[in-house]
Amino acid sequence: DVGASYFITELFRNNAIICSQIAEQHIQKIVNAIAEGFKQPQFVEMLEILCIVNKKPLRRNQTIVVKLLIEKQQETMVLFNDVETVQRRNQLIDIGDHEANENSLLNFHMKMIDLITKCARGRVYEAEIKAQSLYSLNDILTQLSDPKNLWDIKSLFVIFLQEVYFETEKKVTGLAVNRTVWNIISTIEKVATTEI
């Protein structure tokens, strides 16, 4: 129920005591709702509120949320990270689905990228590794360099890159000399100067 999701979101928002005591099985119920077809941004926001409390990451919940989402990745995530799904994303962009419908698949996708990024915030190794499995450096480069992609999505990927690859608990070896990283930085510079 969408109304219940708004109520629960507000009940948990910035409530460190309740958020730190929520049982994994209750988090699982939210993930199950998403898996059962409730791919709406407010369900992702419920998970986000459990992970970030008063602008501070809650490591336990971050780890639980990303673990549960990855376990049901096919049912819970809209990644748009292959040729076929990128074409679908572009169709949704062309019809303005994200502007016409706050519960659109594109808005869900953006909230999901943001959630995964927030699950890695604060250098949570388990979440970083799982997030890196969702989007490789090449995937991020593709997302950033795609002229059809929305600036809102691109900006989320820049933050994802920062939290998941650069600000990590365990350093990603060879990152400083990785050609893809430098291509990403060059692409960010081009995108920033042409789209801002």
Sequence positions of predicted segments:
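Extended alpha-helical scaffold regions
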Residues: 1-196
